[in-house]
From Swiss-Prot:
GO BP field: positive regulation of defense response to insect; response to oxidative stress
Transit pept. (range): 1-69
Annotated catalysed reactions: 2 glutathione + H2O2 = glutathione disulfide + 2 H2O
Species this chain originates from: Arabidopsis thaliana (Mouse-ear cress)
Similarity comment text for this entry: Belongs to the glutathione peroxidase family.
Protein name: Putative glutathione peroxidase 7, chloroplastic
Keywords assigned by UniProt, alphabetized: Chloroplast, Oxidoreductase, Peroxidase, Plastid, Transit peptide
Length: 233
């Protein structure tokens, strides 16, 4: 199945479908367009050279190399992450299983519907090999402020979540978790490397390849047919 991006159809939580200045801020300092004329200093002789950089794409080499390494990874299965209890988990344990990877939050307007539907989908398909990997993130409106134990208690007590929940991560900016660098580099869509909001979703096939990316406004139930296709493949 070739990767595709399910486009945004409606605004959510007050954010328009097009990237806003707020979401643009999550790009961090590594990616910027510039139309100014700049001076470049040669460190060997101290000479400044005036040059035009109109429409030049500026990329900090350090951040670029991090993204390049993530893109070079062959699949999701090449990564090791920490679970909600701080234990290392090699994602190769999920080989042969379709995955839905979601950045979650406990205090979002999308929390109740997403957690409820995710739990129902997991209960329905877990015995067929389907897995949901939830990554808490506090980058969107500060809506996941709790500690890992608090997040775990919330998800497992209120929504009876049985799917794996992992350590809190950044999904945008210079501290982006390696797994999310990989997901975004393989499923850019029109948003490029920006995660728009809580509950954005990546569907991964049995070989660890990203095959679909869904905006936060796509409910888990809307993804069910795509999950069934991967289970049958």
């Amino acid at each position: 199945m070739a990767f595709s991006y399910a486009s945004f159809s409606t605004p959510f939580n007050g954010f328009a479908a097009n990237p806003s200045p707020i979401t643009s801020a999550f790009l961090g300092p590594s990616l910027r367009f510039s139309t100014r004329t700049s001076k470049t200093r040669n460190p060997s002789n101290g000479v400044s050279v005036k040059s035009s950089n109109s429409h030049r794409f500026l990329v900090k080499s350090k951040n670029f190399s991090v993204y390049a390494r993530a893109a070079a990874e062959k699949s999701v299965h090449d990564f090791t992450v920490k679970d909600i209890d701080g234990n290392d988990v090699s994602l190769d344990k999920f080989k042969g299983k379709p995955l839905l990877i979601v950045n979650v939050a406990s205090r979002c307007g999308l929390t109740s519907s997403n957690y409820s539907e995710l739990s129902q989908l997991y209960e329905k398909y877990k015995n067929q090999g389907f897995e949901i990997l939830a990554f808490p993130c506090n980058q969107f409106g500060g809506q996941e402020p709790g500690s890992n134990p608090e997040i775990k208690q919330f998800a497992c007590t209120r929504f009876k979540a049985e799917f794996p929940i992992f350590d809190k991560v950044d999904v945008n900016g210079p501290s982006t978790a390696p797994i999310y660098k990989f997901l975004k580099s393989n499923a850019g869509g029109f948003l490029g490397d920006i995660i728009k909001w809580n509950f954005e979703k990546f569907l991964v096939d049995k070989k660890g390849k990203v095959v679909e990316r869904y905006p936060p406004t796509t409910s888990p139930f809307q993804i069910e047919k795509d999950i069934q296709k991967l289970l049958a493949a």
